[in-house]
Structures are given as structure tokens and as C-alpha cells.
């Protein structure tokens, strides 16, 4: 906002990439081992310190335990039994950020990781469950190796959280995963538009509903962060997560000014366009403009 405010003083156009809490949605049809592998890769790359890292997981309660266990196994496979001793595992950028992240963790809700080393500014890949929107970890962009998992369950349905018209089909009924998808859409749309969104599902209708009704900068179906890696598509946010896009041709166009130029030939000229206009000219102009 400060950049935009300063640029506005000089009428300078801007492109802003502002980050945000990027959701990772996993429904009951997802291939969990593969989903876990790709979530762990995207979340813990550079210790979660990337603008498009999955910030939190929304999942169906029916698969939560299996998903969390698969994520736990993938963390061990990718980073070893003790990630803090892995020389290839990164560290938090500075002490201030390190202590901010520790303040977001809740030991009672931590089911994986939670260890840290203040001397090396390292925090182990951490997973938290039974998280609510009121928890500190959901109050800001995490930008670190902490993955909260929120679940859809019967209690949410009883409160009416999932009852909306976003995802009903032509008959007015929900698909097998419809209630969960409704809830996920509501969760995303009730918060600032994220920079990225990731959806793991084998249900094509559910995929279309998520893409049609969620506002976000960019994302992936059945993967994480790789949309950022191509120069063939623009990258950027929307709303609270930014404006404009760049990468490849889109970046060139974003930072270019297109001028409209007419190179008019001089070997002929149509006098009909010039004053004075009489009845004959008016008829000809009207016929021409049709």
C-alpha cells in the first residue's frame, strides 16, 4: 500500500505481488500419498519461506488422519528422521522471524515436528491439527515451516457453515464431496483473496467448482507451487494478494507502454470528412458509417 500510495503521487503504474494465506484443499477423492509428497515439497521448500507456499490445509475429516500420517511419512522421507541435523534443510531468515514463528506454534496441537534450534535458527517441519480460525497461526501469513490442518466435520454442517448455493448441481443437490467443497469455498471466500490456491482431487466437477467460485492469484490442481515456474503464464495476485502479473511475455507487456500509431498515406485524401457538411455529404457519411 505504501508503494502504491507513493507511485500514485507521480501517476506511476505498479504491479504488486503481496502474498497472503494460500490454502491447500484436499478432498476425499485425492490420491493421498502423492498429495502428501507434493504438499511437503511445496510447503517446506526453503523452510516455507516462499510467497506461494501452501499456508494451511483444508481437508475432509474422513481422510484427515490418513493425510496427516502420509505427510509425516513424507517429511521423514524428504528430510530424514531429524531434519534439524540435515545439512540440506534450510533455516529461518533472521532471529525476529524465528521468534515470530515460535509464537504461532501450539504444542498441544502439534502432531509432527515442533523441534527448533535457536542457535541455528532452524525449526523442524511442523504439522498442527484441530486448528481453528481463532488460533494465532491462522491470523497472519505463516511464511515458515508450520502447516495447520483444518477439517470439515458434522459440527460445521450443524452450524450451517457449509449450507450455501455455490456448488449445487442442476438438480439442486450436492455431489458426494459437495458439502466439503462448499465449506472450503466459503472458508476461502470469507478471507482475503490468496496469492495461490492448491486443490487435490480426482473429482472433475469439484475441480471446476473450486476454480469457478474461489478468487486467487494462481494455483495448481493436484500439485503445489509449480505454476510459478513457467514463463508461459503470468504470475500475480488479486485483491489483497496483489495486482497485475509478470513472467515471460506477460512481464514484458506489464512493464511496457503500448502506443497507438496511425501511419496515414498521402497519395489520396477523402474530402468528405471535412467541413462544410451538406445533405449529400451527410447521406454518404451515414452510409459509410453503417
PLM regions with names:
Residues 1-133, 151-176, 221, 289:
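ALDH superfamily catalytic-core signature
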Residues 25, 123-290:
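Conserved C-terminal structural/oligomerization subdomain of aldehyde/semialdehyde dehydrogenase
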Amino acid at each position: 500500500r505504501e508503494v502504491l500510495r507513493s507511485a500514485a503521487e507521480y501517476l506511476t503504474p505498479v504491479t504488486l505481488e503481496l502474498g497472503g494465506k494460500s490454502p491447500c484443499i484436499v478432498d476425499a477423492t485425492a490420491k493421498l500419498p502423492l498429495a502428501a509428497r507434493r504438499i511437503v515439497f511445496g510447503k517446506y521448500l526453503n523452510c516455507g519461506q516462499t510467497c506461494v507456499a501452501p499456508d494451511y490445509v483444508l481437508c475432509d475429516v474422513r481422510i484427515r488422519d490418513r493425510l496427516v500420517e502420509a505427510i509425516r511419512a513424507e517429511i521423514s522421507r524428504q528430510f530424514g528422521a531429524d531434519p534439524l541435523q540435515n545439512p540440506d534443510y534450510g533455516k529461518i531468515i533472521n532471529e525476529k522471524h524465528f521468534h515470530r514463528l515460535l509464537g504461532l506454534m501450539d504444542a498441544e496441537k502439534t502432531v509432527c515436528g515442533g523441534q527448533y534450534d535457536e542457535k541455528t535458527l532452524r525449526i523442524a517441519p511442523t504439522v498442527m491439527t484441530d486448528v481453528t480460525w481463532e488460533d494465532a497461526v491462522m491470523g497472519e501469513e505463516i511464511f515458515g515451516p508450520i502447516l495447520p490442518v483444518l477439517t470439515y466435520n458434522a459440527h460445521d454442517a450443524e452450524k450451517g457453515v457449509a449450507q450455501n448455493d455455490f456448488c449445487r448441481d442442476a438438480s439442486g443437490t450436492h455431489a458426494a464431496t459437495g458439502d466439503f467443497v462448499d465449506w472450503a469455498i466459503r472458508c476461502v471466500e470469507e478471507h482475503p483473496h490468496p496469492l495461490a490456491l492448491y486443490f487435490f482431487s480426482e473429482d472433475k466437477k469439484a475441480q471446476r467448482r473450486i476454480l469457478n467460485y474461489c478468487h486467487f492469484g494462481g494455483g495448481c490442481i493436484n500439485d503445489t507451487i509449480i505454476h510459478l515456474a513457467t514463463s508461459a503464464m503470468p504470475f500475480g495476485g488479486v485483491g489483497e494478494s496483489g495486482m497485475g502479473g509478470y513472467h515471460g511475455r506477460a512481464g514484458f507487456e506489464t512493464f511496457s507502454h503500448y502506443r497507438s500509431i496511425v501511419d496515414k498515406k498521402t497519395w489520396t485524401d477523402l474530402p468528405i470528412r471535412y467541413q462544410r457538411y451538406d445533405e449529400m455529404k451527410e447521406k454518404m457519411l451515414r452510409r459509410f458509417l453503417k
